[in-house]
Amino acid sequence: FVACIRETSAYTISNYVIYSDDNGATWNVSGRASVGGDEAKVVELNNGDILMSIRTAGKRWYNISHDGGVTWNETISEWDDLIGPACNGDLIRYDENTLLHSLPKGDSRRDVAIYISKDEGKTWNEGKVIVPRYSAYSSLCVLPDKTIGMFVEEREVDTTSYEMVFYRFPIEYLEAMNQ
């Protein structure tokens, strides 16, 4: 899992991966994966690389580890097709050919959408809005019947209180329309 660490008294946060190679008997900390990002998520790619999606104030950053998360590329890249307005989201593998990423669509905390990548995170589709109102943090899972579950904060008006809501839908719902 990814840990966000403030290494100095400054507000700058770095991301590290905490991992186990022995089913949790012992734990290790990776090298620094990013400086200045927050609330990162990781997914294993088909070739064994680890892809990290990193929250920033603008577009989502990403980084790749080629050694199971022990070390990370020196250069951080950004996705042109994922904005992620300084908000947490989730990144999971649906199947061998499909990654899913949940984030608010646009530049504010509303309209949480799920984006699909069919090329291991190189590009993302336009995204399907799941929550067409104020919404923010979300978590995804693939259920045993291969439907997708999403747990998300949402609210009807611009207040500080959110309700937690669970959605369930088939992958075909996401693939049917890009909006």
Model-identified regions with their sequence ranges:
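Asp-box/BNR beta-propeller blade signature and adjacent active/binding-site loops
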Residues: F1-Q179
